C-alpha cells in the first residue's frame, strides 16, 4: 500500500513531497561537490589529480544544483504543493503525467552521476561547448551520458510545464480571475512558458552534438562546414531563460513571505509585479549572447545585447522596490522566513548590480571567465534562489507537515548560512578583478589570501547544512503543533481546515471562494 502510494502517486501533495525530498538529497550531493571544489582551491598546489577531474566536479556541481536541486524544489516541490491549493483546484490537471514528470528525474540524475564516473568524466563545464565536448577531446561515453541525462530532465520539465499551464488556465476556482492570481502562481505560470519555449532548443543543440560525436555529422565542426559558435547560440538561447526559470518562482515565494510577515493582504503594486514577471520572461529570451561577448561578434550586435541586458534591470528593480514598499509602514513579525526574504532582497540586489557591470560588453571582455562572473551568479543563485527556497520552506513547512520548526534554531541556521555564503563569494569579486580565471584547479600564490577566505566560508556553509538536518529532525521528533496565522493571508493555502490540508483537498468541487481584495 505504502509502496504504491509513493510509486504510482497521482496526488499533487505526495508528488510535491517526493520532489522536495529528492531536491534535498541532490542538494546534499551538490553541496558536497562544491566543498570539494573549494577545498582544492583553498591553497595553491594540487589536491586532486589534474584539471580534468576538477572540471568534472565543477560540471557535475552545476548541473546537479540547477536541474536536480533548484528546479525540482521550486517548481516540482513548491509548485505542486501550493498551486492547486492557491487557486482552489482539487489537484493538477494531469495527475499521472505529474507522476511521470517526477520519475523521469531520478534516472536522469543517475545518468549524470554515471557521466562523471565513466572514462575520465565530463570535464566540459555545464555549457558542454564543442570542440571540447566533441568525440575527439572527450572520447568515450561520458558526454553522451550527460546528454541523455539532460534529455530526460528536459522532457520532465516540459511535461510539468504543460501540466502547470493547463492547471492554471483551466482549474481556477470561480472568482479567481487572472488579476487575482497569487504572485507565486503567476511566477510559475511564466516560468512554465519559459521552459516550454527554451528546452526544445537545448534538446536540438545536444542532439546535434550527440550526432556529431557518434555518427559523423558536422553541425559544430568547421571541417565539414559546421560552426561551434552555433552551439553557443543554441545553448545560451536556452541557458539564459534557464537562469530566469531558476529565480522567477523564488520571486513569487518572496512576494508571499514579505506580504505575510508585513501583515499586508497583498504585496505593494500587485499588477506592476505581474507585469514585471511577464516582462522579465519576455526579455529573458532577447539577451542570450551577453554570455558570448568574447567570441568575436560585431560591435553593433554587442551594443544591442548590452542595452537589452540592462533593460532587464528595470522590471527587476520594480520588484525590489515593490518588496521594500510592502515592508514600508508595517509592524514586522521577525520570524525566520522574513529573515530569509530580507536576506534575499539585499543579496539578490548585490548580485544584480554586478550583473549590470557584466552587461557592458567592453568590461565583460576583461571579466569574462574570471571569478567575478562566479561571484555574480552565485550571489543571484546561492543567495537568491537558495535563500528563496529557505524562505518558502520555513514559511510553508507547517502547512506541508503539520509541525513547526524551532523558532530559535532556524534563526541560527539563517545566521550561519548568511555569514558562510557571503564569506565564500564576496572575496571572489576581488579575485576576478585581479584576473583569476574560472575552471582552473590551481593558481599563482598572489591569489592565496582571498581563496583561503572563500574556502573557510564554504566550510561554514557546510556546517549550516548539518544545522538544517538537525532542524528537520527536531521538528518531526518534538511535533510542535503550528498555530494558524494570526491574520489571514491574501492567498488561499492557509484557509483550509487542517495542516496539512487533507489528502484530497475537497470532497466535492468547491462552488465559490470569496477573496477579500
From Swiss-Prot:
Class of this enzyme: translocase
Predominant location: mitochondrion
Cofactor: how bound: Binds 2 heme A groups non-covalently per subunit. Binds a copper B center.
Alphabetized InterPro entries for the sequence: Cyt_c_oxase-like_su1_dom, Cyt_c_oxase-like_su1_sf, Cyt_C_Oxase_1, Cyt_c_Oxase_su1_BS, Cyt_c_oxase_su1_dom
TM stretches of this protein: 17-37, 63-83, 100-120, 145-165, 183-203, 234-254, 268-288, 305-325, 338-358, 380-400, 414-434, 456-476
Residues at which Fe(II)-heme a binds: 61, 378
Pathway: Energy metabolism; oxidative phosphorylation
Assembly information from the UniProt record: Component of the cytochrome c oxidase (complex IV, CIV), a multisubunit enzyme composed of a catalytic core of 3 subunits and several supernumerary subunits. The complex exists as a monomer or a dimer and forms supercomplexes (SCs) in the inner mitochondrial membrane with ubiquinol-cytochrome c oxidoreductase (cytochrome b-c1 complex, complex III, CIII).
Designated name of the protein: Cytochrome c oxidase subunit 1
Position(s), cross-link 1'-histidyl-3'-tyrosine (His-Tyr): 240-244
Coiled coil: none
Keyword terms of this UniProt record: Calcium, Copper, Electron transport, Heme, Iron, Magnesium, Membrane, Metal-binding, Mitochondrion, Mitochondrion inner membrane, Respiratory chain, Translocase, Transmembrane, Transmembrane helix, Transport
Residues that, per the record, bind O2: 244
Cofactor: heme; Cu cation
Sites where the protein binds heme a3: 376
High-level lineage: Eukaryota, Metazoa, Echinodermata, Eleutherozoa, Asterozoa
Subcellular location per the Swiss-Prot or TrEMBL entry: Mitochondrion inner membrane
Gene behind this protein: COI
Source organism of this protein record: Pisaster ochraceus (Ochre sea star)
SUPFAM superfamilies, alphabetized: Cytochrome c oxidase subunit I-like (SSF81442)
Functional note: Component of the cytochrome c oxidase, the last enzyme in the mitochondrial electron transport chain which drives oxidative phosphorylation. The respiratory chain contains 3 multisubunit complexes succinate dehydrogenase (complex II, CII), ubiquinol-cytochrome c oxidoreductase (cytochrome b-c1 complex, complex III, CIII) and cytochrome c oxidase (complex IV, CIV), that cooperate to transfer electrons derived from NADH and succinate to molecular oxygen, creating an electrochemical gradient over the inner membrane that drives transmembrane transport and the ATP synthase.
